[in-house]
């Protein structure tokens, strides 16, 4: 018995799992879009943690 030699089986890996990969990519982009929409609301636009605020792209309203 040769334990170091593995036999190659024709097991499909990508074919049954492609819907999960596509769903993951779609979910990632939808969450990114929702996060960007949330960052640009009036409530969070002047938050110092907002990247646009740090870059100086937002005027402070007094």
From Swiss-Prot:
Membrane topology field: Single-pass membrane protein
Main location: mitochondrion
Protein family (similarity comment): Belongs to the ATPase j subunit family.
Presence of the UniProt keyword Nucleus in the record: no
Membrane spanning stretches: 13-32
Function: Mitochondrial membrane ATP synthase (F(1)F(0) ATP synthase or Complex V) produces ATP from ADP in the presence of a proton gradient across the membrane which is generated by electron transport complexes of the respiratory chain. F-type ATP synthases consist of two structural domains, F(1) - containing the extramembraneous catalytic core, and F(0) - containing the membrane proton channel, linked together by a central stalk and a peripheral stalk.
Gene for this chain: ATP18
Record has Transport as a keyword: yes
GO cellular component: mitochondrial inner membrane; proton-transporting ATP synthase complex
Swiss-Prot/TrEMBL keywords: ATP synthesis, CF(0), Hydrogen ion transport, Ion transport, Membrane, Mitochondrion, Mitochondrion inner membrane, Transmembrane, Transmembrane helix, Transport
InterPro entries: ATP_synth_F0_jsu
Subcellular location: Mitochondrion inner membrane
The protein's assembly and partners: F-type ATP synthases have 2 components, the catalytic core F(1) and the membrane-embedded component F(0), linked together by a central stalk and a peripheral stalk. The central stalk, also called rotor shaft, is often seen as part of F(1). The peripheral stalk is seen as part of F(0). F(0) contains the membrane channel next to the rotor. F-type ATP synthases form dimers but each monomer functions independently in ATP generation.
Protein source organism: Yarrowia lipolytica (strain CLIB 122 / E 150) (Yeast)
A GO term, aspect molecular function: proton-transporting ATP synthase activity, rotational mechanism
Any single biological process term in GO: mitochondrial proton-transporting ATP synthase complex assembly
Record protein name field: ATP synthase subunit J, mitochondrial
């Amino acid at each position: 018995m040769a334990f170091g030699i593995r036999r190659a089986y024709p097991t499909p890996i990508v074919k049954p799992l492609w819907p999960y990969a596509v769903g993951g990519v779609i979910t990632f982009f939808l969450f990114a879009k929702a996060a960007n929409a949330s960052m640009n609301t009036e409530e969070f636009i002047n938050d110092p943690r907002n990247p646009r605020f740090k870059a100086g792209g937002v005027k402070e309203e007094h």
